[in-house]
């Protein structure tokens, strides 16, 4: 899936079934369903999922937990990046 296709999918009421888990997590996060996004990334054990896990905790305001997950992903806490910028960056890393 390409970037614009993903963005267009956000106009739909349900998540496209073909999305892999990390993209599904970003989709649900964009739709305001933080808990669902969090549940999805908890089930995946890779660097991308850890980055998204960090992002959702940062969005929640749980910086301590977010820093833990950034560390697991080999990343640093993005002090100067907005949540919107980080979400977009994560998406671009996955779909180009």
Question: Predicted regions: what is each one?
Answer:
Residues 23-27, 56-57:
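Residue-level signature for tetratricopeptide repeat
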Residues 11-12, 18, 54-63, 80-96:
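TPR/TPR-like alpha-solenoid helical repeat scaffolds
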Residues 1-13, 26-39, 88-90:
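Repeat-mediated protein-protein interaction surfaces in helical alpha-solenoids
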Residues 8-15, 38-47, 74-78:
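Solenoid-like repeat scaffolds
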Residues 21, 50-53:
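TPR repeat positional signature
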Residues 45-47, 59-81:
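TPR/TPR-like (Sel1-like) alpha-helical repeat modules
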């Amino acid at each position: 899936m390409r970037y614009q296709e993903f963005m267009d999918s956000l106009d739909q009421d349900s998540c496209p079934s073909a999305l892999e888990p990390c993209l599904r997590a970003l989709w649900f996060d964009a739709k305001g369903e933080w808990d669902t996004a969090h549940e999805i990334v908890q089930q995946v054990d890779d660097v991308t999922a850890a980055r998204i896990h960090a992002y959702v905790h940062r969005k929640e305001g749980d910086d301590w937990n977010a820093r833990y997950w950034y560390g697991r992903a080999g990343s640093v806490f993005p002090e100067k990046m907005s949540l919107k910028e980080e979400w977009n960056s994560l998406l671009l890393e996955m779909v180009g």
